[in-house]
Curated annotation (Swiss-Prot):
It is found in: Nucleus. Its main location: nucleus. GO terms for biological process: mRNA splicing, via spliceosome. InterPro entries: BUD31 (IPR001748), BUD31/G10-rel_CS (IPR018230). One of its GO terms (cellular component) is spliceosomal complex. Keywords: Nucleus. Belongs to the BUD31 (G10) family. It comes from Oryza sativa subsp. japonica (Rice). This is Protein BUD31 homolog 2. It holds the Pfam family BUD31.
Length: 145
């Protein structure tokens, strides 16, 4: 007899420890997606979504690499299920990108003169005091800040 495939996902050991936090962040994400954006610029409507996505990825990254509280199996499960952005986490592992806010800020095709975003400039080199990234609303994610 052929095996019957079920749609039920087997969660790895330790999932019950991180599930409440991920559920809270998912609820915040749904709320941010459904939030009306009256009076905001087109790009400002996406800023809360980018922040929550960054927060979820940073939570899983910190649990695995910094605090070492979750197993590799659980970490890879979270990446495969889309609970964290694996490309952003891959950049966080590289020197100079430890505090990167989003991947759009380092893509040169989205910026004038093929450079990176203004939030990647260290604070002591900026001419203006308060500046926000157009893509995600970040105020500064350079490693030297």
């Amino acid at each position: 007899m052929p095996k019957i495939k079920t749609s039920r996902v087997k969660y790895p050991e330790g999932w019950e420890l991180i599930e409440p936090t991920l559920r809270d962040l998912e609820a915040k994400m749904r709320e941010a997606e459904n939030d009306p954006h009256d009076g905001k610029r087109k790009c400002e409507a996406l800023w809360p979504i980018f922040r929550i996505s960054h927060q979820k990825s940073r939570y899983i990254y910190d649990l695995y690499y910094r605090r070492k509280e979750i197993s590799k199996e659980l970490y890879e499960f979270c990446l495969d299920q889309g609970h964290a952005d694996k490309n952003l986490i891959a950049k966080w592992k590289k020197p100079g990108y430890e505090r990167l806010c989003c991947l759009r800020c380092i893509q040169t095709r989205d910026h004038n003169f093929a450079t990176t975003c203004v939030c990647r400039v260290p604070k002591h080199l900026r001419e203006e005091k308060v500046i926000e990234c157009v893509h995600c609303g970040c105020r500064g994610c350079a490693s030297g800040d």
